[in-house]
Amino acid sequence: MVAPTPTSALLHSSTMVKAGVFLIIKLCPALGNNHAGTMAMFVGGITFFFASCAAISQSDGKKVLAYSTISNLGLIVCCAGIGSYEAAWTAIMIVIFHAVAKSLLFLSVGTAEQQLGSRDIERFDGLFNAMPHLCLCMVIGISGMFLAPFGMLISKWAAMKAFIDAGHPMLLLLLVFGSATTIFYWAKWLGKILSVMNGQERREQGITKGEWFTLKTLSWMTIIVCILFPLISSYGVLPYLRITYGFTRDVIAQSNLIIMSLMVVLLVI
């Protein structure tokens, strides 16, 4: 993880690491009910679980994000290996949600490193006092990765449904335990940056307008993608799936959408 942070944000959130899984998603209909799909399912599921476990032992912010990326790529491959309509929808939505939230986190870590001289999460104590606006950007990015009602949780909800409908309880267990494992490192990160320490001086003066523009744009994109995900699904994902599978239907029931809408309202309040 020695590349400049903007390069890491570009390569490890939305371009290089997504190139391979993009091809696997394109092959998703052909992977259903065969040995290649079964291998992809279990390799992806095991990768998701063990990469999540590996992230717990890391304190370098970029390494935590790197292992988290590997974990989510494993989940995408696992969903694509199932080959079902619901699993394909889930894989595509994970790609979208992950791209914006993880880009925000990589750039936030880079900005913190520039101001603090370190990207070690253990040294992020009191970031809320020293750089409150940057801290807010990090909170939004972390929330986008694992908290309700942000995008990744929506995708994992849909993944659970896809695994159950496909009759793969072992994959469901890997998803549940792997998702539970992510709580450890994201909660640790949140606890560090939200801790309040008296007497710290403000350090945001050195952050340029260009950096703020990028961070705030990605923060709003993380929120907007979550709120507008039904429209993204209806006008972006479902037309592709209609061409690929020949039919469309709702992956997440209307009642669940209402629950998620209430979560958004409570979050705003």
PLM region spans:
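Cytoplasmic/organellar membrane-interface segments at the starts of transmembrane helices
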Residues: 129-135, 186-269
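Hydrophobic transmembrane alpha-helices and their helix-loop junctions in integral membrane proteins
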Residues: 1-206, 216, 227
